[in-house]
Amino acid sequence: MNKRKGLVLLLSVFALLGGGCSQTNNKTDRQAQTVIVGTGTDFPNIAFLNEKGELTGYDIEVMKAIDKELPQYTFEFKTMDFSNLLTSLGNKKIDVIAHNMAKNKEREKRFLYHKVPYNYSPMYITVKEDNHKIHTLKDLHGKTVIVGATSNAADYITKYNKTHGSPIHLKYAGQGSNDTANQIETGRADATIATPFAVDFQNKTHAFRQKTVGDVLLDTEVYFMFNKGSQTLADDTDQAIKKLEKNGTLKKLSRKWLGADYSKSSFEK
């Protein structure tokens, strides 16, 4: 009789332990908040499709590393044209943008940034390899510069034109990352403002012959963008970025995807 009671008690203990484990796992699953990460597929080395059609690049891999550091979230990527990213964030179709985004006053009015930049984008004047006349902004007077319509480069040239009598003809690129390079290659534009890693990627993958010239015009701090109500997510992202910077992950990913360590400002090096 005692043996039977002991067996029943033992089975009851196992059942309780099993039930407890199941509840803990389910609770963890329920607590994990799904975060939709909006990004593009045409940004060389940053967010693009590789030869296997897989989404990858510096921003993508940094986001995956952040996801591993934050068990309370599950990140899912949603791709779209760059021109639709801000609208989708504003409409809450996505929760965060990962696409080499810089701050500007207009964006800060509508959206939220975390505090610690995860990358810096040094921007240079970019021309064809056989162009030996353009080296500075003054050399661009009377020339056509092509940039993305909502890019930091567009904002920079627009401000320059306002204070210098609009000497540079500003032209906006169409869809796709190749449009800018194609227009420079064919002579429809004289220059653009780009990063060395983007130029190198285009030269290797599309046989363009272009180069960066002169000094760094901008060394833009790069952030992820959130909706105004996502302060907790932004703060958690900051903590993860600090850890990734400290343990060398950002430097490692930057060197792998961008060819150098851009986790620090060029002006600090």
Curated annotation (Swiss-Prot):
Subcellular location per the Swiss-Prot or TrEMBL entry: Cell membrane
Keyword annotations of the record: Amino-acid transport, Cell membrane, Lipoprotein, Membrane, Palmitate, Signal, Transport
One record GO biological process: amino acid transport
UniProt signal peptide: 1-20
One Pfam family, short name: SBP_bac_3
GO terms for cellular component: plasma membrane
Induction comment from the UniProt entry of this chain: More strongly expressed in the presence of methionine than in the presence of sulfate.
Matches recorded under SMART domains: PBPb (SM00062)
Lipidation (N-palmitoyl cysteine): 21
S-diacylglycerol cysteine lipid modification positions: 21
Entries under CDD domains matching the protein: PBP2_TcyK (cd13710)
Membrane topology: Lipid-anchor
Stored InterPro entries: Solute-binding_3/MltF_N (IPR001638)
PANTHER family: L-CYSTINE-BINDING PROTEIN TCYJ (PTHR35936:SF18), MEMBRANE-BOUND LYTIC MUREIN TRANSGLYCOSYLASE F (PTHR35936)
Quaternary structure and interacting proteins, as annotated: The complex is composed of two ATP-binding proteins (TcyN), two transmembrane proteins (TcyL and TcyM) and two solute-binding proteins (TcyJ and TcyK).
Assigned protein family: Belongs to the bacterial solute-binding protein 3 family.
Functional summary from the UniProt entry: Part of the ABC transporter complex TcyJKLMN involved in L-cystine import. Is also involved in cystathionine, djenkolate, and S-methylcysteine transport.
Protein's name in the database: L-cystine-binding protein TcyJ
Organism: Bacillus subtilis (strain 168)
Source taxonomy: Bacteria, Bacillati, Bacillota, Bacilli, Bacillales
Gene: tcyJ
